[in-house]
Amino acid sequence: MRSSLTPLGPPVSRDRVIASFPKWYTPEACLQLREHFHGQVSAACQRRNTGTVGLKLSKVVVVGDLYVGKTSLIHRFCKNVFDRDYKATIGVDFEIERFEIAGIPYSLQIWDTAGQEKFKCIASAYYRGAQVIITAFDLTDVQTLEHTRQWLEDALRENEAGSCFIFLVGTKKDLLSGAACEQAEADAVHLAREMQAEYWSVSAKTGENVKAFFSRVAALAFEQSVLQDLERQSSARLQVGNGDLIQMEGSPPETQESKRPSSLGCC
């Protein structure tokens, strides 16, 4: 099936156009070391053979303790603002960001979940169906890093095993420097490996690494979506081409008599 999808609404902004595969933050804890899109994905994009990928919203869930800066991170990327007046998220909120990846329209639905214990039962209902789970912590507070284990466990419980990309993100990078930053990142990289997650350090205040991080998230999710769609197309072709007859609604059922070959000889 060839795709003739066009973006819904106005063209995406230039900083949402991804032509090449975004690089990882550190090779010591990354989900994909390749520097290019998967060959099948590149070929499908060139042929515009990406099925319905351009019409779907891929769900991204951001979890973590109160005050780690989840909302600030999302607002810096989606609105390019940094609000110094903190307001806790009540329940859940979300933003939709549109991209153009390898010439194909693609959208992320980014869910901002509350960090307060009293909202956990509400937020957990929105973990389901996530393609990406971002576990955020404060680089200046080691306790928030330790808590990411539980946040990730809660989010994974609502999704099928192996179905989600996992990112561990250290926020407030602008508040650390030198040896303190190196130690905090080393601890985080160690945990990211345990989680089978990709690690990033960012600053919502300065914007450092924020765009690069979300571009990486979008590219990995897009690549997976295209590969899954190609697999579905392949499975559909196999089912149609396996030699079985397709019974049309209203047509008479086939009998053993009708299956016999007709004799066309003279009597």
UniProtKB/Swiss-Prot annotation:
Q: Which domain of life is it from?
A: Eukaryota
Query: Does the keyword field hold Mitochondrion?
Result: no
The record gives the membrane topology as:
Lipid-anchor
Disulfide connectivity for this sequence is: none
Which GO terms label this protein's molecular function in UniProt? GTP binding; GTPase activity
Keywords assigned: Golgi apparatus, GTP-binding, Hydrolase, Lipoprotein, Magnesium, Membrane, Metal-binding, Nucleotide-binding, Prenylation, Protein transport, Transport
Q: What does this protein do?
A: The small GTPases Rab are key regulators of intracellular membrane trafficking, from the formation of transport vesicles to their fusion with membranes. Rabs cycle between an inactive GDP-bound form and an active GTP-bound form that is able to recruit to membranes different sets of downstream effectors directly responsible for vesicle formation, movement, tethering and fusion.
The name on file for this protein is Ras-related protein Rab-36
Which source organism does the UniProt entry give?
Homo sapiens (Human)
